[in-house]
Amino acid sequence: VTGTTLGYSVGEPWNQKAVKKGFGVPVITSDVLWDNGADKVFGITTSFAEQNPNTTVKVVKALIRASSWLDENDYAHRKEAAKLIAQTNYIGVDEDIITNSLTGVFEYEKGDIRPLKSFNTFFTGQYGIPYYSDAIWWLTQMRRWGQIAETKPNNWYLETAQKAYRPDIYTKAANSLIAEGKMKKEQFPNLATATFIKPPQTSRLDGVVFDANKPTAFLAAFKIGNK
């Protein structure tokens, strides 16, 4: 596509591949715009979760262990992970291309290699926990840009988030790992008492304070978009 595409937005390893092959230069990385923003999601249907409760918990356990493994000991396992997913039956990209962003560096153009420690974070900072407040933020954006056609009251946002995000399943998986001695209790917040609503926070992207308890007020704070 060289010469036919002016720009694109894509995740790794495709930006680093563009640099290595000499047909692209990244302008900015998403973490500069949105620090610790969500990127990938694991989702299943309600019917699958209800019909396969044990399988569902086991899959979440595997995801928790894998994400913890990727972050532990100052990213000590990231090169091994890059070697695994570089295989043709997974991503099929050169190992050194994948290694860059996984190990905390990013090459903006050939020779311009900069540290980017938090570019990929999987477990540290409780990023894998399904917080209702995160779901509510996404829902406000869907309303703001018209994917949700009509105005919704505050309670709708939380009720909808609770249908999609399942911290109860995450908690079962975490407690099981702790009981098995595969994870430590200290690696998690107090899931038994958690509300799964984060405190109000200001986004680096737009500078507007987001309070998950007041989604309609958050929407009203923007000059552009649906309310």
Task: Label each region the model flagged.
Residues 10, 44, 51:
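A conserved hydrophobic position in a structured secondary element of the catalytic/binding core
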Residues 24, 38-47:
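Small-molecule pocket liners
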Residues 1-12, 17, 21:
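Short helices/loops that flank or line small-molecule/ion binding pockets
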Residues 136-227:
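Conserved C-terminal helix/tail region of periplasmic/extracytoplasmic solute-binding proteins
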Residues 13-16, 32-35, 48-49, 65-66:
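Solvent-exposed loop/turn segments at secondary-structure junctions
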Residues 51-166:
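Secondary-structure end/capping motifs
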Residues 17-31:
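Ligand-binding "clamshell"
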